[in-house]
Amino acid sequence: MKKQLPHILSLSTVAKSRLFEIQAVELKFSNGIDRTYERFRPFNRDSVMVIAIDGEDLLLVREYAVGTEQYELGFVKGGMDMGETPEQSANRELQEEIGFGAKKWTFLRKMKINPQIMGHKMHVLLGEDLYPNQLEGDEPEPLEIVRYPLSQLDALLDSDEFNEARNLAALYSLRDHLKKR
C-alpha cells in the first residue's frame, strides 16, 4: 500500500541570497500532526558529474571549495543548462574544466543530494574516448588536472583528499560498472 503524502498547508520564504532561497514548508501528515520544515526552494536544474577515463587513468580536478576553505580533489561537475541532455551537459563541463571532450558516454546513475532539504538531482556519467577541446568556463582560476591510475581505485577510495560523498558514490558506481565489463 502506498503511503499518503503529507498535505502542504503553506510555503513561505524565510531567507534569500543570490544563490539560495530557503522556504518554510508547513505540512499536515496523514496522522493529523502538523510540522514545519525548512528546505531549499526547488529549482528545475539538475547537474552532472563526469568520470573521465583517459587510457588507464581517471582525470580528476583539484579546485577550491569555499565550504571547507581548502582545495578538494574530485570529478568534473556542474549544472545543466536549459535544453541540454545529461550527455551534452557532461561534455560541455568536461571541455570547460579540463579541456577534453568525450566521444563515448555511459550513464552510471542518478543521485539525490539531500532529499530532506532539497530536490536536486545529479546525473553521473562515464566519459571515454577523450579528445582535446577547451571551452571557456566560469571557474575563477584554472583547475589542476590530476591523473589517477584506474588500477588504484581502492587507494583513491581510502584517500583523505578524495572524501566528498558524491565523489565516493560515483567512484563506487564506476567500480561496479568496470567489474561488469
Residue spans for each PLM region:
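Extreme N-terminal tail/first-helix region
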Residues: 1-17
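Unchanged
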Residues: 46-49, 54, 80-165
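Short beta-strand segments
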Residues: 34-37, 73, 146
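Conserved Nudix-box catalytic region and its N-terminal flanking loop in Nudix hydrolases
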Residues: 2-5, 40, 48-92
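Long hydrophobic alpha-helical segments typical of transmembrane helices together
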Residues: 155-181
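Acidic, metal-coordinating catalytic segment for phosphate/diphosphate chemistry
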Residues: 13-49, 54
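Acidic pyrophosphate-coordinating catalytic loop
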Residues: 13-18, 30, 42, 66, ...
